[in-house]
C-alpha cells in the first residue's frame, strides 16, 4: 500500500468513533482530509463539525457539513487529527501544516483525541521532525534566541502566515526526552503562541496505518 492509501485507511477507520447527532472536532492535513471525506458519508447523521483551519473548513463545507465556531459549542466528544510524529506515550509533534494553535485548542476541549497516522509517523523519541512553534511576528528573533538556549536550531518558515496571522519557527536538532517539560518551557517564552508539542494533552487513541491493516493503540 502507498503512504496515501495508509492515510486513507486510518481516516475511514476513525468513522467508528463518530456518534450520530454530535459535533465532531476535525484536524488539518493530508490524513485529516481523508477523514473529512469519510465524514461526508455521515453528514446527515451528525450535527456538524468544528474545524482547526480555513482549509479544513472549506473542505467540510464543500461536502455539505455544517461548520460551527468553537465558541458556539459546549463540548466535543471527539477530535480527529493526524500527527507528524507520535511516540509510545501518545505524545505528538504536530504543526507541519501550520494549524497547530487551533488544533491544540480544539484538542483541549474534546473528550477524546483520536490520532490518525501511517506507520512512518511512529517514533521512539520525538524531535527528528522539526518542532513547529507559532510566534507573534514582532517576537520572531527574540523567541529564536531563546529556542537556541534550549538546544534547538530554529529556522523561520519563509512565506508562511498562519490562519491567526502569525509566523512559524521550525526547531531542528532536538532530542525530546521530556516532552511535557519542553512544551511548558517553550510555551512560557514571551511571544510564543504555542508549540507543536502535544504532550500535556496527548492522544487517547491512535489509529496507525500499516501494511497489515489499521492498528489501534489505546492510552
UniProtKB/Swiss-Prot annotation:
Substrate binds at residues 28-31, 81-84, 94-97, 121. Its EC number is 5.3.1.6. InterPro entries: NagB/RpiA_transferase-like, Ribose5P_isomerase_typA_subgr, Ribose5P_isomerase_type_A. The active site is at residue 103. CDD domains: RPI_A. It is an enzyme of class 5 (isomerase). It catalyses: aldehydo-D-ribose 5-phosphate = D-ribulose 5-phosphate. It comes from the Bacteria. Pfam families: Rib_5-P_isom_A (PF06026). GO terms for biological process: D-ribose metabolic process; pentose-phosphate shunt, non-oxidative branch. GO terms for cellular component: cytosol. Pathway: Carbohydrate degradation; pentose phosphate pathway; D-ribose 5-phosphate from D-ribulose 5-phosphate (non-oxidative stage): step 1/1. Keywords: Isomerase. Catalyzes the reversible conversion of ribose-5-phosphate to ribulose 5-phosphate. Homodimer. Belongs to the ribose 5-phosphate isomerase family. NCBIfam families: PRK00702.1, rpiA. This is Ribose-5-phosphate isomerase A. It comes from Enterobacter cloacae.
Amino acid at each position: 500500500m502507498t503512504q496515501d492509501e495508509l492515510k486513507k485507511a486510518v481516516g475511514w477507520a476513525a468513522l467508528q468513533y463518530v456518534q450520530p447527532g454530535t459535533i465532531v472536532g476535525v484536524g488539518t492535513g493530508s490524513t485529516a482530509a481523508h477523514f473529512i471525506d469519510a465524514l461526508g458519508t455521515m453528514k446527515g447523521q451528525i450535527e456538524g463539525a468544528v474545524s482547526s483551519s480555513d482549509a479544513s473548513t472549506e473542505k467540510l463545507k464543500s461536502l455539505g457539513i455544517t461548520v460551527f465556531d468553537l465558541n458556539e459549542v459546549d463540548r466535543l466528544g471527539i477530535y480527529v487529527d493526524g500527527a507528524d510524529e507520535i511516540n509510545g506515550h501518545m505524545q505528538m509533534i504536530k504543526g507541519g501544516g501550520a494549524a497547530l494553535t487551533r488544533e491544540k485548542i480544539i484538542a483541549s476541549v474534546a473528550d477524546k483525541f483520536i490520532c490518525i497516522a501511517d506507520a512512518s509517523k511512529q517514533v521512539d523519541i520525538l524531535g527528528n521532525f522539526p518542532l513547529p512553534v507559532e510566534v507573534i511576528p514582532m517576537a520572531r528573533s527574540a523567541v529564536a534566541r531563546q529556542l537556541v538556549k534550549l538546544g534547538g536550531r530554529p529556522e523561520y518558515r519563509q512565506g508562511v502566515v498562519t490562519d491567526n496571522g502569525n509566523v512559524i519557527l521550525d526547531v531542528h536538532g532536538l532530542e525530546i526526552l521530556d516532552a511535557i517539560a519542553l512544551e511548558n518551557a517553550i510555551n512560557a517564552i514571551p511571544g510564543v503562541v504555542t508549540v507543536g508539542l502535544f504532550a500535556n494533552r496527548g492522544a487517547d487513541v491512535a489509529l496507525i496505518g500499516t501494511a497489515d491493516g489499521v492498528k489501534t493503540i489505546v492510552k
